[in-house]
């Protein structure tokens, strides 16, 4: 495949880590956020990969902690007039596309995603134009502009089922942007899939040799893997799935020790689900030159207590998500198709 933009060779500048807060500062911001949420008629919608203290705050204030599909559902149905989306930018955009009448706030609008960055809309449009006979399916981890070009949007929790459905209709697929997830879905369904070559900087760093050594050290452990991981890591898994599916697998598997190959932010909810089980991080070869993300998305880490308080307190463009209305209407079509399809799966 030849594209103008090569995600494999792209180096994304990582944001600086937030300044650590003292115990007193954390307590101050937690109480301030709780008060501001009530004053703004706002609710928190947080992703599993945000830091534990952010997820805990969402729980305590009646918010949502979930994968991107459930975040979209929850935000669209909740009566609050303001959604505080703790995650990365495409999640805030998706919330605005589905709920244009609501105010969508984010702790920072600079929280990117390597999959989103790795799929620039101009190059992606050219790629799609070169293959006009293919149905365009894009992962939720994309910009509003890329979604607007798609026929379908999909999350990892329903990717296999959707592609299996489209394949049964004889459709050939363009899949973007995650090459590992695309390869996994193709292997599961046998579909005719042409993949864009993006990757998640967290999951792409899991190392087979290091995971093998950890498995040898803990032979009684089950391995849970997100399908954004390289094929060699997926092949070692006892369970493969989206964040919500991995939490469900943790409960179902009989093993008392679990090696988890996804962003370590998931440990907060997974440990709640299996309090008596031991959770181990799958290795990325450790902190230092051999890994950049080291099993935690640096942009998810930008969602801090101080920035959440600022988003709720300060009106204006520094925190509010805006999506062009014509673009929003186009992106809404494949998003609604995803939600309708997901609803049929739920029965």
From Swiss-Prot:
Cofactor detail note: Binds 1 [4Fe-4S] cluster per subunit.
Primary localisation category: cytoplasm
InterPro entries given in the database record: NadA (IPR003473), NadA_sf (IPR036094), Quinolinate_synth_A_type1 (IPR023513)
Pathway(s) this gene product operates in, as recorded in its UniProt entry: Cofactor biosynthesis; NAD(+) biosynthesis; quinolinate from iminoaspartate: step 1/1
Catalytic activity annotation: iminosuccinate + dihydroxyacetone phosphate = quinolinate + phosphate + 2 H2O + H(+)
Coiled-coil segments: none
Stretch forming the signal peptide: none
Enzyme Commission designation: 2.5.1.72
Top-rank taxon, per record: Bacteria
GO cellular component: cytosol
Pfam families: NadA
Keyword terms: 4Fe-4S, Cytoplasm, Iron, Iron-sulfur, Metal-binding, Pyridine nucleotide biosynthesis, Transferase
Residue positions binding [4Fe-4S] cluster: 113, 200, 297
Compartments where found: Cytoplasm
Free-text function comment from the UniProt entry: Catalyzes the condensation of iminoaspartate with dihydroxyacetone phosphate to form quinolinate.
Family: Belongs to the quinolinate synthase family. Type 1 subfamily.
Official protein name in the record: Quinolinate synthase
Source organism: Escherichia coli O139:H28 (strain E24377A / ETEC)
Gene: nadA
């Amino acid at each position: 495949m030849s594209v103008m933009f090569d995600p494999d060779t792209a180096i994304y500048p990582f944001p600086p880590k937030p300044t650590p807060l003292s115990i007193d500062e954390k307590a101050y911001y937690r109480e301030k956020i709780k008060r501001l949420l009530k004053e703004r008629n706002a609710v928190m919608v947080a992703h599993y990969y945000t830091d534990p203290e952010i997820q805990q705050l969402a729980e305590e204030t009646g918010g949502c902690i979930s994968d991107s599909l459930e975040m979209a559902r929850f935000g669209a149905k909740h009566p609050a007039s303001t959604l505080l989306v703790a995650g990365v930018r495409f999640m805030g955009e998706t919330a605005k596309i589905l709920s244009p009448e609501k105010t969508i706030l984010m702790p920072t609008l600079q929280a990117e995603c390597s999959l989103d960055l790795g799929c620039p809309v101009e190059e992606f449009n050219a790629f799609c134009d070169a293959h006009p006979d293919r149905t365009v399916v894009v992962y939720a981890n994309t910009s509003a502009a890329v979604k607007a070009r798609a026929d379908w949007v999909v999350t990892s929790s329903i990717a296999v089922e959707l592609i299996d459905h489209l394949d049964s209709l004889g459709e050939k697929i363009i899949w973007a942007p995650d090459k590992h997830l695309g390869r996994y879905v193709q292997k599961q369904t046998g579909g005719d899939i042409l993949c864009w070559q993006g990757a998640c900087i967290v999951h792409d760093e899991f190392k087979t040799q290091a995971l093998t050594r950890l498995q040898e050290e803990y032979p009684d452990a089950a391995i849970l893997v997100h399908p954004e991981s390289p094929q060699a890591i997926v092949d070692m898994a006892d369970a493969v799935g989206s964040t919500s599916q991995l939490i469900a697998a943790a409960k179902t598997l009989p093993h008392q020790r679990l090696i988890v190959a996804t962003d370590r932010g998931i440990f907060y909810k997974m440990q709640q689900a299996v309090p008596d089980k031991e959770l181990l991080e799958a290795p990325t070869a450790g902190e230092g030159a051999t890994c950049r993300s080291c099993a935690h998305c640096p942009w998810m880490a930008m969602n801090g207590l101080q920035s959440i308080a600022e988003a709720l307190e300060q009106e204006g463009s520094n925190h509010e998500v805006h999506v062009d209305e014509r673009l929003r209407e186009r992106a809404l079509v494949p998003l609604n198709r995803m939600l309708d399809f997901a609803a049929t799966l739920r029965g």
